Amino acid sequence: MAIPIKEYIGIQENAVVAEGGVELVGLVISSADIVTGDSHKADYDAGKVVTLSKDEAVAAFTHPSTETAAVAAAKHTLDMMVAYGAYKVKVIKKSTTYLAAFQSACAQDGSFGAFAIDAASDEEDDIAVYNQSLGAQHLFVSADSTATLANKYLLKVNVYNDQGTESSGDDVADDFKQIGAVLGWASAIDHVGANGASTLMYKDLGVDATVYDLATKQTYDAANVNYCGLVQTHGPTRKFFQMGRCADGMDAGVAMSSIYMTASIENAWIALAMGATKIPANSDGSSQVLGLVLKVAENAVTNGAILVDKPLTQAQQRQIVEFTRNEAAVISVQTTGYYANAEIKLVGSDYVCAYTLVYAKGDHIAKVSGSHILV
């Protein structure tokens, strides 16, 4: 199934970037006044997305227990983001609703790869549905104090916390340490370097363990709710995130790679179109579009976001043929990691270059099992 390059409603100043210059940082939607610096306060109060450097963010991280729950939670989330890798962060103040603030953030500056809100909210389903409708653009990281979530939303990471129902101060902020750690991990992934693609699984991000026993682990694993688990392995005791999945079961690292690849192709297209007199609606034009798609795919192979020689099931092979209508595409995916093509279509009065990119996503080995044969 061909996926058309999305229509750009508006081009932000930082959207036209050099090749490899795509940035995906984290966004926190806050219901409280957490930005107080003179250079940003007016924009923040006006509902604009504010980008804070690491130093600017750290300067705002004083959150005494006398602060409201929302302030403490939002600041602690930002604090953890910087502590675990994010070199800058984005924040936007909640307007009438969290959903409205998220929609406004998307319209203003969509260069955030992952985002969270500063509290548990009955709007989470609405936000997840809207985010899913946007395609591979953002990862929604959400706190969950129970394992009852039955939704299978795409691009949503549910994170378990066990801090109860505290109502103010640093106790509530503790609930959001894990969200901040996940946002920091997502914002710090190296999407350009060799083998930079990452997985949330097995990462010790410095947060407290919330799951200690097998029965609880199995409950949360079945619900695709992530947690920091305490594991004892024949002596050493370790804690790390498990299982690193989105609500629909996809690896969260794979989702972030997909978001980056989509953004890279979109930005490369804008740069191509702006740098030419025109891109012709013929085979020459489709070849130019295909060329930028192939370049992104090749970079993803180097990065580990696309895997060469990954075993494919019969069902996956049938799916490739169904999508591409080309049996040779299976061999291409197995030997090079991907298959791509592009074609010109007339949609209404506009010619659209629709591309198809099928690739072996960068899954990781989740466990090791073996047989010992003594002879």
Regions found by a protein language model. Give the residues of each.
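Surface-exposed assembly/interface segments
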Residues: 1-375
